[in-house]
Swiss-Prot record:
A cellular component annotation (GO) from this entry: endoplasmic reticulum membrane
Keyword field contains Transferase: yes
Function as written in the Swiss-Prot or TrEMBL entry: Catalyzes the synthesis of phosphatidylserine (PtdSer).
Protein known as: CDP-diacylglycerol--serine O-phosphatidyltransferase
pH-activity relationship: Optimum pH is 8.
Pathway the protein takes part in: Phospholipid metabolism; phosphatidylethanolamine biosynthesis; phosphatidylethanolamine from CDP-diacylglycerol: step 1/2
Lineage: Eukaryota, Fungi, Dikarya, Ascomycota, Saccharomycotina
Membrane topology classification: Multi-pass membrane protein
Length: 276
């Protein structure tokens, strides 16, 4: 049977409050404007990093059908956009930072942990760049939001925790705090994916009025602090404030509580940071 163009025409579906928003290339640094036609959400209406405030149209039903029905080898890679590949470079940077921490642990050579800090900074650059590329190319992405969140978890959650462990935060209690920190980042990103459409928007720009909890990239402050400690030799036995209850079951480094506080800040709903 010959298929007509009508067979692949986009279909309109009634919109309800529980509809899942079409996946767009966005991250937690962005704001969004509601597209009243069809009740969907246009991608990247405005953010402090946006080139302009003009929203892009989300992928339509034809894009979704093409993405899900293509069963050829490497079809997923062919359907990714340039912005998606830049997001994956963010994930690569985070993973390479973790590998550099492992090399530092095995060899003790400080340039490896310095490299770990550098690759987290590089991941931050990719995190800001992916949305700009999507806007310049006027292309929305089906998997952009999920890729962004997963890459951010690796680069700004797991990698900083790996650096902390590598430079001396290695007691059982230290590791529990670092695990809590990573899980808070995971929960924060999951909450963002679910609630971003419900956050109050500025009526003139469509931009979210505030961050709910600390954004994941703010962990860069912890990374810079650890980079300073490495540069000054304040690692292992020289970690500031020493170790509490040394050689006991609950021994820990008091400064590790900074990770605990930051983790609590990421999952806080009462902490609302106004966007500029």
């Amino acid at each position: 049977m010959v298929e007509s163009d009508e067979d692949f025409a986009p279909q309109e579906f009634p919109h309800t409050d529980t509809d899942v928003i079409v996946n767009e290339h966005r991250d937690e640094n962005d704001g969004y404007a509601s597209d009243e036609v069809g009740g969907t959400l246009s991608r990247r209406a405005s953010s402090i990093f946006s080139i302009n405030t003009t929203p892009l149209a989300p992928p339509n039903a034809t894009d979704i059908q093409k993405f899900t029905s293509d069963e050829h080898h490497f079809s997923m890679m062919r359907n990714l956009h340039m912005a998606d590949y830049i997001t994956m470079l963010n994930g690569f940077s985070g993973f390479y930072s973790i590998v550099s921490c492992l090399r530092f642990t095995l060899t003790g050579k400080p340039h490896y942990v310095q490299r770990a800090h550098f690759f987290i900074l590089l991941g931050m650059c990719f995190d800001f760049l992916d949305g700009r590329v999507a806007r310049l190319r006027n292309r929305s992405s089906l998997m952009g939001q999920e890729l962004d969140s997963l890459a951010d978890l690796v680069s700004f959650g797991v990698a900083p925790a790996a650096i902390a462990f590598a430079i001396g935060f290695q007691t059982t209690f230290d590791v529990m705090i670092l695990s809590f920190f990573v899980l808070c980042g995971l929960a924060r990103l999951a909450r963002f994916n679910v609630t971003v459409a419900q956050l109050p928007k500025d009526s003139s720009t469509g931009k979210s009025k505030y961050f709910e909890g600390l954004p994941m990239p703010t962990t860069l402050a912890l990374v810079l602090g650890m980079a300073y400690c490495v540069r000054k030799g304040l690692i292992f036995d020289n970690i500031p404030f020493g170790i509490f209850r040394e050689d006991q079951i609950l021994e820990f480094h008091p400064i590790i509580l900074v990770f605990f506080i930051h983790g609590c800040g990421m999952i806080s709903k009462s902490l609302k940071i106004p966007k500029p």
